[in-house]
Every structure is written in C-alpha cells, then in structure tokens.
From Swiss-Prot:
Protein name: Inner membrane protein YijD
Organism taxonomic ancestry: Bacteria, Pseudomonadati, Pseudomonadota, Gammaproteobacteria, Enterobacterales
Species the sequence originates in: Escherichia coli (strain K12)
InterPro entries: DUF1422
Regions crossing the membrane: 9-28, 32-50, 62-84, 89-108
Keywords: Cell inner membrane, Cell membrane, Membrane, Transmembrane, Transmembrane helix
C-alpha cells in the first residue's frame, strides 16, 4: 500500500512538472500569456522533489513510462487550458484529443499494474 501511494506521488509530481514547464515557457516566451513567477517556482520545486525521489527510492518496472506519460499529459493539459483562455493562440482541439487519449492510456496501464501486483 505504501509503495502504491509513493508511485501515485511520483506520477502526480510528473504531471505537475509537465504543467509547470509549459507554464514557464508560456510565461517567458509568449506575448499573449501574462508573466508570472509561480510556474517557475513550481517547476523548480517539482524537479527538486522528483530528483529526491529518484535518489532515495527505487522505481518499479513500468513506472518511468507512466511518469513520462503523466509529464506529457501535463504539457498537453496546460496547452489546452491556455488555448481555451486565449483563442488567439490557436485551436485547442488537437491537445484536448491527445489529452483524452493519454488519460485513457494511463488509466489502462495503471489498471494492468494493479492486476499484476494483485497476482
């Protein structure tokens, strides 16, 4: 049970890292999105926490792939939300569809991992 909670924490940190890296790039390089220091702070703290987890815990088989998928999901979700808020950037159809596909893929992989652990 404790390992499952640690795995979920790693996946959540990867999602937040994806959100914050896209937010940082949007805040720094997009003239449409207003500047904010909070995505930068969030990115630094998230990367630090992920690095500490990497140093202090072993990652089970399959978790790095799920963490990468959660990171990509965070990037896509931020892009979808920003494009919905600022339609001048472009359509959010493609990131929204990819986000839904990623959510279902992550859910299927997590369900398979849970069944493998139960056996």
């Amino acid at each position: 049970m404790k390992q499952a909670n640690q795995d979920r924490g790693t996946l959540l940190l990867a999602l937040v890292a994806g959100l914050s890296i896209n937010g940082t790039f949007a805040a720094l390089f997009s003239s449409i999105v207003p500047f904010s220091v909070f995505p930068i702070i969030s990115l630094v703290l998230t990367v630090y926490c992920l690095h500490q987890r990497y140093l202090n815990r072993t990652m089970p088989v399959g978790l790095p792939g799920l963490a990468a998928a959660c990171f990509i999901l965070g990037v896509l979700l931020y892009s979808t939300v920003v494009r919905a808020e600022y339609p001048d950037i472009g359509s959010n159809f493609f990131p929204a569809v990819l986000s839904v596909i990623m959510v279902f893929w992550i859910g299927a992989k997590m369900r398979n991992r849970k069944q493998e652990v139960a056996e």
